[in-house]
């Protein structure tokens, strides 16, 4: 087994163990019961949300910490995500780049209506594997994304690829009606400069009412999660990395953010693998002025991991 494949295998094993540990602690009497309660008011509110028009100007690009099935049992976090979405006009479509579709050629998920979901987690109650998110056809967005890519870098259409949990879990909370077309774009590299370039190509879509999302987690040291963290403790490595990122984002210091391997405290514990951090460079690249301060929309911790999320204009 080559080194890259072995790392991917070991990472998948860590994720599986971490999901099982989460499931053992986040074990509500009614799985996703908090989500059901959330829907009792969120659906009506969503129906009143105003849809984006050209007069609104470009939508922001956003980076969100996406969570996993326990998000559906975390009422405060759902309220934060939903409140964020409601503070913006309803997008005409969503294009999302998730930490969980990496090391792939530049590709788009299935664009047909009722896109299937990828249940890329293990050890949770059956309810989470029965959830659906039946979004409208995103074919028009797929064609538009392809049109902004250079001829030398074609976009592949992966007609059988559904939305992974880095996409559908937060979006099911943010847009619970499922009435916004959603398309997922793969993350073909971890290189910040290349991801910034990819984000720049997506920038025109924001002016057309498309919400561009980078989906990851501000700290994601799953191999180092302890029983104490599952019960609310926050380790120094997570706090320190989060404070460093918050400061750099507040200054619009993209160069510092891109130098996280050497400059960020709390490394490599906060990101032993970097796929949950680097989607932010899609977000920053899609910004009109990446060097402007970002606006933090969500902060705090889940399982000791920073769920900091932000938007840029």
Residue positions per predicted region:
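Short, glycine/serine-rich, charged loops/turns that create anion-binding
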Residues: 68-69, 101, 189, 217-222
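A short aromatic-anchored loop/beta-hairpin motif
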Residues: 25-156
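N-terminal secretory signal peptides and thylakoid transit peptides that target proteins
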Residues: 2-37
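Internal, conserved structured core segments that host functional sites
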Residues: 141-195
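Surface-exposed, charge/polar-rich loops and edge strands
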Residues: 147, 180-182, 190, 196-197, ...
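Beta-strand elements within well-structured catalytic alpha/beta cores of enzymes
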Residues: 60-64, 93-98, 185, 205-218, ...
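Short acidic (Asp/Glu) patches
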Residues: 77-82, 127-130, 161-169, 195-198
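Short glycine-enriched loops at secondary-structure junctions
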Residues: 99-102, 112-114, 161-171, 218
């Amino acid at each position: 087994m080559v080194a890259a494949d072995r790392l991917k295998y070991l990472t998948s094993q860590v994720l599986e163990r971490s999901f099982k540990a989460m499931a053992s602690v986040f074990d509500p009497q009614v799985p996703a019961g908090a989500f059901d309660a959330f829907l009792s008011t969120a659906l009506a509110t969503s129906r009143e949300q105003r849809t984006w028009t050209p007069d609104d100007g470009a939508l922001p690009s956003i980076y969100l910490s996406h969570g996993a099935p326990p998000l559906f049992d975390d009422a405060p976090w759902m309220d934060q995500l939903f409140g964020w979405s409601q503070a913006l006009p309803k997008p005409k479509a969503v294009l999302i780049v998730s930490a969980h579709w990496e090391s792939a050629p530049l590709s788009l998920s299935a664009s047909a209506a009722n896109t299937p979901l990828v249940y890329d987690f293990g050890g949770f109650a059956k309810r989470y594997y029965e959830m659906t998110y039946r979004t409208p056809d995103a074919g028009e967005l797929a064609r538009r994304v392809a049109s902004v890519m250079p001829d030398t870098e074609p976009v592949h259409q992966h007609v059988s690829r559904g939305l992974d949990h880095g996409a559908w879990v937060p979006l099911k909370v943010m847009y619970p009606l499922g009435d916004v077309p959603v398309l997922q774009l793969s993350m073909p590299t971890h290189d910040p400069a290349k991801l910034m370039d990819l984000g720049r190509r997506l920038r025109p879509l924001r002016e057309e009412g498309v919400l561009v999302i980078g989906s990851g987690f501000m700290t994601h040291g799953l191999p180092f999660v302890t029983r104490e963290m599952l019960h609310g403790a926050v380790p120094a490595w997570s706090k320190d990395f989060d404070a460093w990122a918050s400061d750099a984002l507040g200054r619009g210091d993209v160069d510092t953010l891109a130098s996280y391997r050497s400059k960020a405290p709390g490394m490599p514990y906060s990101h032993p693998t970097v796929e949950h951090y680097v989607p932010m460079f899609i977000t920053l690249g899609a910004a009109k002025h990446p060097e402007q301060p970002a606006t933090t929309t969500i902060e705090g911790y889940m399982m000791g991991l920073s769920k900091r999320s932000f938007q840029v204009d």
